Design a protein with these regions (language model features):
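Amphipathic alpha-helical segments enriched in hydrophobic/aromatic residues interleaved with Lys/Arg
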Residues: 83-138, 169-170
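A short, Lys/Arg-enriched amphipathic alpha-helix from helix-turn-helix/homeodomain DNA-binding modules
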Residues: 100-103, 148-176
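A general structural signal marking secondary-structure boundaries and capping sites
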Residues: 28, 50, 113-117, 135, ...
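Linker/hinge segments immediately adjacent to helix-turn-helix/homeobox DNA-binding domains
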Residues: 132-154
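N-terminal regulatory/effector-sensing and dimerization cores
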Residues: 2-87, 115-122
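Short, solvent-exposed loop/helix junctions and linker helices
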Residues: 15, 96-99, 125, 158-162
Length: 176
């Protein structure tokens, strides 16, 4: 688990093999993720799935951003299909209790890191397990099984986006 807090002016385009959780603590920050650009505001949480090309840029507001990167090879030992999962947070419903739970978990992880008390590394890993359990239960839109993307019907949130992604991936697997 790698946690960074930063005031972002610009972070060049890159990708990594980890899942990255971006939590805007203050202000706003621009995020380019693939072909899409977003402005994330205070309280917003964005999940960058592994190998997604992304970059950050400043807006007209100063910002403070927490970025938590989870090592997929480590956590896949505990969550078998984690490497094949795709997560989406829908920030349109700010009162969503699942988003509030994510904010709380991320806050506890940050406090454990700042406190650096005895055994804090284990607390951070435990908090990350809680974070992953929440993501898998409430924000997992796809998983890959037998070489095909499967839409997780139990999910809530942006069903339009999930449906669109499901149709696109089904088309790709059927035609290529």
């Amino acid at each position: 688990v790698n946690v960074i807090t930063a005031n972002i002016t610009e972070y060049p385009i890159h990708f990594h093999d980890d899942i990255e959780v971006v939590y805007v603590l203050d202000g706003s920050v621009g995020l380019k993720n693939g072909y899409y650009s977003y402005v994330l505001n205070q309280g917003d949480i964005f999940i960058i799935n592994d190998r997604e090309i992304h970059s950050f840029y400043h807006t007209d507001q100063p910002n403070m951003v927490m970025m938590l990167q989870m090592d997929l090879s480590f956590f896949s030992k505990y969550y078998g299909n984690l490497k094949n999962s795709f997560f989406v947070t829908d920030m349109k419903d700010e009162s969503d209790e699942n988003l509030e739970a994510l904010r709380g978990i991320l806050g506890h992880i940050m406090l454990d890191i700042l406190d650096k008390g005895y055994g804090y590394e284990y607390k951070v890993i435990e908090g990350t397990h809680n974070l992953l359990a929440n993501l898998l239960a409430n924000f997992q839109y796809f998983t890959m099984e037998d070489g095909k993307f499967v839409n997780e019907a139990k999910n809530i949130g942006n069903k339009v986006l999930a449906g669109r992604l499901n149709r696109i991936t089904d088309y790709m697997y059927e035609n290529y």
